[in-house]
């Protein structure tokens, strides 16, 4: 069942972790985890790298450009994978979208 608050991820999206979730390195297990009320998710290394870019400021397009340059990889392939991963996390309630910036 979905909450109705999920986002539809596109290259224009500016995803971030919601207030109730934190990306944290678990020293005991030596893995990165997303901590949310009554839930823990252990993303893989690639997901962690993408999640660390999800600051609500960068757009998905900016993240894809950065990753494509870093890994000298095909931008369209990275975009497809990043959007699919972020959409999956959003559908599970681990991501939200930044609202318009207030200065």
Cite the ranges covered by each PLM segment.
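Acidic, low-complexity/disordered tracts enriched in E/D and polar residues
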Residues: 1-48, 52, 103
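Long, charge-rich, low-complexity alpha-helical segments
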Residues: 36-103
């Amino acid at each position: 069942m979905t909450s109705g608050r999920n986002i539809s991820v596109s290259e224009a999206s500016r995803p971030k972790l919601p207030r109730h979730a934190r990306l944290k390195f678990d020293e005991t297990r030596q893995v990165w985890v997303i901590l949310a009320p009554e839930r823990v998710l252990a993303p893989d290394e690639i997901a962690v790298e993408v999640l660390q870019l999800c600051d609500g400021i960068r757009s998905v397009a900016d993240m894809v450009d950065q990753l494509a340059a870093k890994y000298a990889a095909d931008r369209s392939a990275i975009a497809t994978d990043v959007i699919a991963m972020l959409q999956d996390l959003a559908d599970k309630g681990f991501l939200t979208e930044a609202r318009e910036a207030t200065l």
